[in-house]
């Protein structure tokens, strides 16, 4: 696989070609994903739940993300590697820059932050200092205590309109990717069409430019439960490499997610 850059993803959007992405946390699985030409990997703070056994992502630290970012980069030298900024690691623009630098030095090509228009100055400061940003909207797991649980976001018109405005504001501030989690497919379509940058979805229908899954869900090995929007590709193939290849194929052909794996 040749080195993947943000320009490749922009070209995918411009040409109407969908792309698949996944979380990854170690060198072995990163190598597996690279062998199947997975263009984008995310070292997610979801590691707090799937690796550390926590109830949520809040205990994850910058040091945790940096450690796993180094591991994933070792296994996949050519992917576009995103790294999550953990809870309270970007409370101010200055703090965000300091912590993002740690993750970029660990091998990330981009950092992902959760939140809306209140992050405009943070995104501006990061991008002005050569740190690419993915803006995460919708169900933002670090806000689980504000939401009162893991709930679909953007169902009512006011909330939906605000999310569209936030996506555009963050794009205009310099964000190069928007990630939507657990939002109605109709809202994901609005945002994808409104944004010039690539939009990645999880639990947001198949109208986005790209899709992402937590790898443990893709392989059906999550300890607690399988989200409605996820699919066990390993059960269909019996082989991890074939599972990744099938996931990638179904995303690229817009077969996944289908109606059974879409939030109305």
From Swiss-Prot:
Gene3D superfamilies on file: Phosphoenolpyruvate-binding domains (3.20.20.60)
Gene Ontology MF terms in the entry: 3-methyl-2-oxobutanoate hydroxymethyltransferase activity; magnesium ion binding
Enzyme Commission no: 2.1.2.11
Localization per record: Cytoplasm
Main location: cytoplasm
Enzyme class, UniProt record, top EC level: transferase
UniProt: 3-methyl-2-oxobutanoate binding residues: 45-46, 84, 112
Catalytic activity: 3-methyl-2-oxobutanoate + (6R)-5,10-methylene-5,6,7,8-tetrahydrofolate + H2O = 2-dehydropantoate + (6S)-5,6,7,8-tetrahydrofolate
NCBIfam families: panB, PRK00311.1
Assembly with partners or alone: Homodecamer; pentamer of dimers.
Main function: Catalyzes the reversible reaction in which hydroxymethyl group from 5,10-methylenetetrahydrofolate is transferred onto alpha-ketoisovalerate to form ketopantoate.
Name of the featured protein: 3-methyl-2-oxobutanoate hydroxymethyltransferase
Organism: Vibrio atlanticus (strain LGP32) (Vibrio splendidus (strain Mel32))
